[in-house]
Amino acid sequence: MSTGGTPRPAATFVSRGKRLPTIPSDAEAFGAHMVLRVALETLGPSRLVLSTSLGPESIVILDLVSDMEARPRVVTVDTGRLPEQTHTLLERVRARFGIDVEVLEPDPSDVEEMVRERGPDLFYRSVDDRLRCCDIRKVEPLTKALRQVDGWITGLRREQSTTRWKTPKLGLDLEHGLIWKVNPLADWSSERVWHYIRTRDLPYNTLHDMGYPSVGCAPCSRAIPPGVDHRSGRWWWETPESRECGLHVDSAQISAIGRSHAHDVEPAG
């Protein structure tokens, strides 16, 4: 943070006719609350969306923005394969924070075609099939929402996986049309996240008490032993480097990684 406790003014970034404020050069020195405040004040609440999967990180961020005068739009994606505990949590979150969480859904015709061609559990077949499922059920609905804004807030943390260890607190997302990607908890540890949740007595997914560190679609999430990489509970039949849905890492890159490590991956049981 610059002298005086305020961020350095952002210049304007221009690409393909779109004008967007550049990221403050001292952003990595900001705390989580400051990251959110700078994003809201620079872009405006109507041009910023908080994307939540209702994971622990999202709960912390919702609490951080709940006492701000201006709040971003909040969205979540119902993929059609979420566990019941996640649906229950959504109602608890709405009640606790008094916010309108907009539920995005995949195109029914796209889901129907995919299931007809490859079956309901195609994600076990290959990385490409799994990415197709993630893209139709999760990525595309959120991508449509991101096309309407200048920035999105995520719960990404560097320690979550090998694909996220370089996550900046504020970055530019070119995959979704040149927008800010706001990661206020990038440098937080899992312990810090859970300490915050328990200290503030915030709601969370009860599956976390059953050994699920990461909760996504029901068939693609599982409980794991303590001390294991958090993302190993997601898409565990794939190599660690490919365990992303395509929202935060380009799908083509994930697919290439998956194919290059195919000989290291055990078939799904």
Task: Identify the meaning behind each predicted range.
Residues 2-269:
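Nucleotide-activated chemistry modules centered on ATP-dependent adenylation/adenylyltransferase
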